């Protein structure tokens, strides 16, 4: 019987697959292929679904790859989305995403992809490794979540997680989980959150339930990997969110062990707002021919963000903070509108007779809509001691405050952040734990109470506001000691430095670095109030003392500013404009008020030329304190000699610099290839400005070269430029790369950011054959711990163990011995579980219950029903309890359909009958046994 002709009907997605079913365009079995024609396998297309654990069959793989490619092309058609307006030129519809994912994206509120999403999503869909950098608030989370959901598609019944997202902080991981759930609607993908502070037993149950996506922090994920002996060979999609923070020294031990267990054929993605151009610092990530996408390298921060920097003294920081909150932001005191509304609802619920159970109130609190107020402000402090102190101080001032720091309990952290998100509080005081990735809608202001020591920390802090096209403000308190860091930030951003009112009205807070002081009257009133509160409140004064001690340790361990900025900051701080009124208050103060402020500032900075001993000696004419006078004279003589030598050195250096600059300018003018820097920005030094030229995205040079800002090297480069042929000359330093920017973006910042300095400190220790000491300088293995008053091992400082016992992991790196505590084995015994399924095997249905309960949030709901207690006639509320018991009985009767409680069924099944027959037979044999008595 001949085969019927091919059906002309199109397939469901409007494309015909008969071309793949029949070779040589034959539509039926009647046509015989020619003898010369050979069977050509279809062109293999990279699979869009990460299901590599299936049966290995080449023909099936080819068919699946072809169908996946056709499905992707069909998804790109505008006709696939009926009744929707399709934007031309690179919308989400043109990326080949499925209909369910497009609906979730539209439900999320995304209409047009952001630049980072438009650049990275197609590359990720082509199974390439990506290193992506874009400014804060540009949609980097959706840039890697959308292709992950498209690749995973649906839940796999085979054991093994396929996606892994690592985040440096718990709040960022929680936020990523929320985005994954919102974009994963319409799919049955299962995702879990593994962060520190949560119950290990619950996380054991979730991991045993075979999740598809794991969102975790490195420490807790490594703990579960070692404790449960997890096999990570099934993971095909790895994301390092905020990669520059993850690859710093704090996470070195965790990442080494985690990366060792990941398969080599995985797809690796690195995302952050501050990534260096040199990828050598991420060599441990195992990138394979990555695509580097660096956007917004010139802007770095949002153009909608306006910045203000206030010069204050150390004793005025608390008063300055209160003045900014009260007068600049206009922060209201007392409870917020949301909290008042909540109290009214609670009061009405108490008056309601048939009020619901507390569980319903808890659900209502959890499901509250995130609606921060227009006054929502984040205050960044240096240490957790500062956070506690500022929380108490601002609460004393009447503000609604929340606080978060690293060592806070995880449940408390969730509650505090949720209160701020829902508008229960207006102020969130945090350390840098919340500086990365936290996306709080309608956040209006950011205050840097302690100025950051690195420019990239400043970028992440102020990036919490002015997100997704909204406006925002950042206010920073700058002391005299913080001025070098301010100049480093100004050079990094490449913006003009405006000190005081030197430029008059021509100030742009979004494009300039504008500094100045706060109005003296309001600042002095706030400082007086703080002093009064500290005198009246002993607990607050004790917290301030602890914060001062913590600040000493923080100042000792923070990174140092550049030498050029330190020299330049002395001139900036000593100028009169440093203490002048900030241009932000130009409308409020007249010129006469500005002169008054200058006079008060000069009086405040007055230093008497004589000491009290010299003044008394000159007035009284007596020589009572001869020893003190002699000591002061010797000190004064020494200081004067040092000052003269310093002035002479500065004069000689100035003359040398002027001559070197003149020579370099003359020789550089002869060379046409050397580009001259624009003179529009007088605040940026010429040498630094030459190094701040932006590089193109396609360049991927990896450089270890060190750069010196000394005048001698500049003169040598300028003199050598005469014989350099630009067509053949290859410099050992990059010409177009901004070294200032790369140093600020560096992962190992501080002293180890320079390769030359790091190479000097690198040593190779060889032990002698006889075990004796060598001739070289022996390295001290112990150091003195000032806090604990004892010697501790230096190795503990390097690996972060701080004296805890260490064991060797699979990669050879040292990990904490507490990771192998045996709690997982105890959990299995407690739940009566035997051997768990391995990677590649089918999942066990009884193990998925824990994961499903965790996803639905029903872990803590009890189902037990008990009869109410009998009312006690001797109690005063006897009638009330009696009515309550009667209502409970009526509710139980109505629940059972009005009938009496059903008894146990007496019908026997086959097993019961079989067991009963066996017992009856045993009794019969026992009764028929003859008696032993004779």
From Swiss-Prot:
ATP binds at residues 134-141. Its main location: nucleus. The keyword rRNA processing applies. Residues 639-654, 865-893, 903-915 have a biased composition (Basic and acidic residues). SUPFAM superfamilies: P-loop containing nucleoside triphosphate hydrolases. A motif (Q motif) lies at residues 90-118. It comes from the Eukaryota. GO terms for cellular component: cytosol; nucleolus. One of its GO terms (biological process) is rRNA processing. It is found in: Nucleus, Nucleolus. PANTHER family: ATP-DEPENDENT RNA HELICASE RHLE-RELATED, RNA HELICASE. The Q motif is unique to and characteristic of the DEAD box family of RNA helicases and controls ATP binding and hydrolysis. This is ATP-dependent RNA helicase dbp10. The lineage of its organism: Eukaryota, Fungi, Dikarya, Ascomycota, Pezizomycotina.
């Amino acid at each position: 019987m001949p085969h019927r002709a091919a059906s002309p009907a199109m397939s469901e997605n409007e494309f015909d697959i008969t071309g793949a079913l029949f070779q040589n365009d034959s539509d039926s079995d009647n046509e015989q292929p020619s003898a010369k024609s050979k069977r050509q396998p279809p062109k293999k297309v990279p699979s869009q679904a990460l299901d590599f654990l299936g049966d290995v069959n080449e023909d099936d793989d080819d068919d699946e790859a072809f169908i996946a490619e056709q499905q992707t092309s069909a998804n790109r058609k505008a006709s696939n989305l009926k009744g929707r307006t399709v934007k031309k030129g690179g919308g989400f519809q043109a990326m080949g995403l499925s209909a369910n994912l497009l609906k979730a994206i539209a439900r999320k509120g995304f209409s047009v992809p952001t630049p980072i999403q438009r650049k990275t999503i197609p590359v990720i869909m082509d199974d390439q490794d990506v290193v992506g950098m874009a400014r804060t608030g540009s949609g980097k989370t959706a840039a890697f979540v959308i292709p992950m959901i498209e690749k995973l598609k649906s839940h796999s019944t085979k054991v093994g997680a396929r996606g892994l997202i690592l985040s440096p902080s718990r709040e960022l991981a929680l936020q990523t989980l929320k985005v994954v759930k919102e974009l994963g609607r319409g799919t049955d993908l299962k995702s879990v959150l593994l962060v520190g502070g949560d119950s290990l037993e619950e996380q054991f149950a979730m991991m045993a339930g075979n999740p598809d996506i794991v969102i975790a922090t490195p420490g807790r994920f490594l703990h579960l990997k070692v404790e449960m002996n997890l096999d990570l060979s099934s993971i095909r999609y790895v994301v390092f969110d905020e990669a520059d923070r993850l690859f710093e020294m704090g996470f070195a031990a965790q990442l080494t062990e985690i990366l060792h267990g990941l398969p080599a054929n995985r797809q690796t993605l690195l995302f952050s707002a501050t990534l260096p151009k040199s990828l050598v610092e991420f060599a441990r990530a195992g990138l394979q021919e990555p695509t580097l996408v660096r956007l917004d390298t010139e802007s770095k921060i949002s153009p909608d963000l306006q910045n203000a920097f206030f010069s204050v003294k150390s004793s005025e920081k608390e008063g300055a903070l209160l003045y900014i909150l009260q007068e600049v932001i206009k922060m209201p005191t007392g409870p917020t509108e949301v909290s008042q509304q909540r109290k009214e609802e609670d009061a009405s619920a108490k008056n309601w007779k048939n009020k619901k159970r507390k569980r319903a109130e808890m659900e209502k609190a959890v499901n509250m809509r995130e609606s921060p107020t227009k006054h929502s402000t984040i205050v960044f402090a240096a240490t957790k001691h500062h956070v506690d102190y500022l929380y108490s101080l601002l609460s004393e001032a009447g503000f609604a405050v929340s606080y978060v720091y690293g060592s806070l309990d995880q449940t408390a952290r969730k509650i505090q952040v949720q209160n701020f998100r829902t508008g229960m509080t207006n102020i969130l005081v945090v350390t840098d734990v919340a500086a990365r990735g936290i996306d709080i809608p309608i956040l209006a202001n950011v205050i840097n109470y302690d100025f950051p020591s690195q420019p990239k920390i400043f970028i992440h802090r102020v990036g919490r506001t002015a997100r997704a096209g909204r406006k925002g403000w950042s206010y920073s308190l700058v002391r005299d000691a913080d001025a070098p860091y301010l100049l480093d930030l100004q050079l990094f951003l490449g913006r003009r430095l405006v000190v005081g009112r030197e430029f008059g009205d021509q100030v742009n807070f979004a494009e300039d670095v504008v500094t100045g002081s706060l109005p003296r009257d309001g600042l002095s009133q706030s400082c007086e109030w703080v002093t009064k509160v500290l005198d009246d409140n002993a607990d607050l004064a004790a917290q301030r003392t602890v914060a001062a001690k913590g600040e000493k340790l923080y100042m000792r361990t923070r990174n140092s500013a550049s030498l050029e900025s330190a020299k330049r900051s002395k001139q900036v701080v000593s100028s009169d404009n440093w203490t002048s009124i900030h241009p932000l208050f130009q409308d409020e103060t007249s010129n006469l008020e500005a002169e008054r402020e200058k006079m008060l500032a000069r009086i405040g900075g007055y230093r008497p030329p004589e000491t009290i001993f010299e003044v008394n000696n000159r007035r009284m004419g007596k020589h009572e304190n001869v020893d003190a006078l002699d000591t002061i004279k010797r000190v004064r003589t020494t200081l004067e000699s040092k000052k003269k030598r310093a002035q002479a050195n500065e004069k000689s250096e100035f003359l040398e610099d002027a001559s070197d600059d003149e020579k370099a300018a003359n020789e550089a003018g002869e060379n046409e290839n050397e580009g001259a820097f624009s003179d529009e920005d007088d605040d940026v030094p010429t040498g630094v400005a030459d190094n701040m030229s932006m590089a193109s995205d396609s360049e991927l040079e990896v450089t270890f070269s060190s750069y010196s800002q000394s005048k001698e090297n500049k003169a040598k480069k300028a003199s050598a430029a005469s014989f350099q042929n630009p067509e053949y000359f290859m410099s050992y330093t990059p010409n177009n790369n901004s070294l200032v920017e790369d140093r600020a973006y560096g992962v190992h910042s501080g002293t180890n950011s320079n390769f030359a300095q790091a190479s000097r400190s690198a040593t190779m220790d060889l032990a002698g054959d006889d075990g004796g000491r060598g001739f070289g300088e022996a390295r001290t293995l112990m150091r003195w711990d000032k806090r604990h008053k004892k010697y501790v091992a230096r190795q503990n400082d390097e690996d972060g163990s701080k004296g805890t016992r260490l064991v060797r992991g699979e990669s050879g790196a040292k990990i904490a011995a507490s990771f192998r505590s045996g709690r997982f084995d105890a959990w299995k015994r407690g739940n009566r579980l035997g051997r768990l399924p391995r990677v590649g095997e089918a999942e066990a249905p009884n193990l998925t219950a824990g994961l499903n309960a965790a996803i639905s949030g029903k872990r803590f709901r009890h189902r037990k029903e008990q009869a109410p207690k009998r009312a006690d006639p001797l109690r005063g509320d006897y009638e009330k309890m009696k009515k309550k018991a009667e209502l409970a009985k009526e509710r139980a009767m109505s629940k059972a359909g009005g009938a009496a409680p059903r008894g146990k069924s007496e019908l026997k099944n086959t097993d019961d009958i079989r067991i009963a027959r066996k017992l009856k037979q045993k009794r019969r044999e026992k009764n028929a046994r003859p008696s032993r008595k004779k």
